[in-house]
């Protein structure tokens, strides 16, 4: 099978080992650039990654894994969009990609906070699956998925070749996703 990197003990173990190894250096790199509130949220996430990575009951989907505007080609015909960069595809929560895309697409956290619930409602409604996947479940998956962009920013910043542009991009990703996770009280899922 082409999708071997899904919800598995191997993946959880890989990330659980990688995060504590790279996170302290990541914090040093971005000290003074990223808010202490986001660092504290990250500390809680890293310390409780085992709780975060527990598979919850409910539907799972194929996640693109890096769904941000840079990885979407918009096509005028039939109102379609083409998703690029599938190297991080995995099985995950149905709203992971939605949370990631929304968090990285708004430069103002207040604008994101004002818009996201209505965007998620519209997305959920378009799926026509209310009987099997309630909006409440989708919203909780969205809130939980708000950590995805932060985790991607931390891990990617520390494993790719370092550049000035990359440092800024990963800082912005971490900030936007971090503010989203804080606003949505995603830390409550770590208890």
Residue map of PLM features:
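Generic recognition of stable, solvent-exposed alpha-helical segments in well-folded globular domains
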Residues: 21, 62, 67, 93, ...
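Regulatory N- and C-terminal appendages and interdomain linkers associated
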Residues: 40, 53-54, 79, 136, ...
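Amphipathic, well-packed alpha-helical segments that form the structural scaffold of globular domains
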Residues: 43-50, 68, 99, 103, ...
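C-terminal structured subdomain/cap of oxidoreductase catalytic cores
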Residues: 79-80, 87, 98-101, 108, ...
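Active-site acidic catalytic loop and adjacent metal/ATP-binding pocket
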Residues: 46-94
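ATP-dependent phospho-/nucleotidyl transfer catalytic cores
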Residues: 1-64
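Active-site activation/catalytic loop segments of kinase-like enzymes and analogous catalytic loops
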Residues: 91-130, 146-168
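A short glycine-rich, hydrophobically flanked beta-strand micro-motif that places a catalytic Asp/Glu
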Residues: 72, 132-139
């Amino acid at each position: 099978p082409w999708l071997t990197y899904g919800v598995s003990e191997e993946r959880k173990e890989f990330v659980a080992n990688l995060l504590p190894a790279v996170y302290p250096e990541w914090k040093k790199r971005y000290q003074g650039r990223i808010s202490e509130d986001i660092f504290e949220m990250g500390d809680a996430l890293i310390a409780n990654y085992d709780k975060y990575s527990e598979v919850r009951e409910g539907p799972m989907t194929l996640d693109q894994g890096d769904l941000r505007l840079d990885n979407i080609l918009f096509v005028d015909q039939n109102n379609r969009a083409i998703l690029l960069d599938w190297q991080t595809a995995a099985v995950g929560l149905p709203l992971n990609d939605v949370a990631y895309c929304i968090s990285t697409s708004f430069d103002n956290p207040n604008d994101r906070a004002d818009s996201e619930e209505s965007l998620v409602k519209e997305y959920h409604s378009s799926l026509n699956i209310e009987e099997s996947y309630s909006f409440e479940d989708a919203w909780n998956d969205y809130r939980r998925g708000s950590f995805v962009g932060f985790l991607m920013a931390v891990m990617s910043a520390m494993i790719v070749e370092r550049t000035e542009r990359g440092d800024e991009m990963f800082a912005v990703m971490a900030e936007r996703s971090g503010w989203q996770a804080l606003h949505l009280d995603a830390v409550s899922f770590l208890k």
